[in-house]
Amino acid sequence: LELMPNSENLRKEIKKVTVTSGQAIVEFHNTSYIEVVVANDNARGGRANIFIFDEFRQIDIDVLNDVLKKYLASEREPEFLKTEKYKHLPKQEKRKYLDRNKQIYLSSAFFKDHWSYKEVQSICRNMLDDTKRYFICGLPYELSIKEGMLNEDSVKDEMSNANFSSIKWSMEMECLWFGDVDGAF
């Protein structure tokens, strides 16, 4: 919403924006939409092709696996597959044109004994497998300073504060996981 006044392209593409206490949806002219859902057990029944799990480490693992990931049940079928040229193709042949659903996880790092660390490790392993399509990256605070999104003097001030926690800073701003994994001592 806040970017629309400065972007002619966004104004051309976005049909309608609805933000109420119980709903947040951005509808596009091409019939696509972005919908925000609360990460709880009541979110059952929705469908999506791309799911962004913001601050995913704060989501209950059972809600993530048993409710939210179920949104990705069916793949998006491009409209051209319904045209005369393609509609006769066997199901197996059509599969190569389907857009695979995507999951995007956003979060700061956290404690290594939390389930989210195991998830990140799994993503790293899968990223190394050439038969899979995974990606992970960390964007530490130095990048924000370089890009002018974070003031370096403000960072220095925060670090000099008597209540500064280097552990929390490392997890939140340096993409560093903290502690030991289960069973380590």
Predicted features and spans:
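Generic beta-strand/beta-sheet core signal
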Residues: 29, 37-39, 54, 80, ...
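Inter-Walker segment of RecA-like/P-loop motor cores
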Residues: 1-49
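Extended hydrophobic-aromatic, low-complexity segments
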Residues: 46, 61-62
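Conserved aromatic-histidine-acidic binding/catalytic patches
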Residues: 44, 56, 161
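Non-catalytic, compositionally simple segments
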Residues: 9, 62-185
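Glycine-rich nucleotide phosphate-binding loop and flanking beta-alpha elements
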Residues: 42, 59, 112
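Walker B catalytic acidic pair
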Residues: 52-58
